[in-house]
């Protein structure tokens, strides 16, 4: 993450490739199998960084505009998701995005921002997994949505378990 004026063309292309082109490539390769089965589920991973900040003045928690390009790629992915949902609805293929409500502290994120976050700013990987599992089994009319993981869990009354299937685990760092 860095301000927009510090992104080289190479880094912009890499980020667009990872966050937009690669998911679309995988979707295009998977669609023939979904067409044959006459159903399918596509779940893209988005981010709250796609939202426009309110301002001025802009209170971005001290990060200024460092999420700008990353957020732009996630906004593009969300738009592709709703476009695909409208194109594929009659084929019983659900297409949704899900984003964490708080930061998911993957190993990579932990290395970059882990020391900057409190446990209240962290969502467990297990919570993301539970919301993704719901979207992988949702009804055909549940398509074209940009969901927020913890909201899905609350709306669907889901119980978040740890990755071994034990005691409920909702937020904070994974054990």
Each model region followed by its residue ranges:
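Conserved Rossmann-fold SDR core element
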Residues: 78, 82, 88-100, 140-147
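Conserved mid-core segment of classical short-chain dehydrogenase/reductases
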Residues: 1-13, 54-62
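Conserved catalytic Lys-bearing alpha helix of Rossmann-like short-chain dehydrogenase/reductases
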Residues: 20-23, 69, 73-81, 95, ...
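A short helix-coil junction within the Rossmann-fold of NAD(P)-dependent oxidoreductases
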Residues: 2-3, 29-41, 52
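Catalytic loop of short-chain dehydrogenase/reductase
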Residues: 41-76, 81-89, 102
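A short, exposed helix-loop element centered on a Lys and neighboring polar residues
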Residues: 27-28, 82
């Amino acid at each position: 993450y860095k301000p927009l004026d510090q992104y080289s063309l190479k880094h912009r292309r890499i980020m667009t490739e990872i966050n937009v082109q690669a998911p679309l490539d995988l979707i295009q390769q998977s669609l023939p199998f979904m067409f044959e089965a006459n159903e399918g589920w596509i779940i893209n991973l988005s981010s709250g960084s796609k939202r426009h900040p309110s301002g001025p003045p802009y209170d971005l928690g001290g990060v200024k505009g460092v999420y700008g390009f990353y957020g732009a790629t996630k906004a593009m992915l969300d738009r592709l998701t709703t476009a695909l949902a409208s194109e594929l609805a009659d084929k019983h293929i659900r297409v949704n995005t899900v984003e964490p409500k708080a930061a998911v502290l993957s190993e990579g994120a932990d290395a970059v921002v882990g020391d900057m976050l409190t446990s209240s700013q962290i969502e467990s990987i297990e919570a993301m997994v539970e919301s993704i599992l719901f979207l992988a089994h949702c009804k055909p009319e549940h398509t074209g949505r940009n969901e927020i993981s913890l909201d899905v869990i609350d709306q669907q009354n889901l119980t978040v378990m740890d990755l071994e299937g034990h005691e409920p685990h909702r937020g904070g760092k994974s054990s």
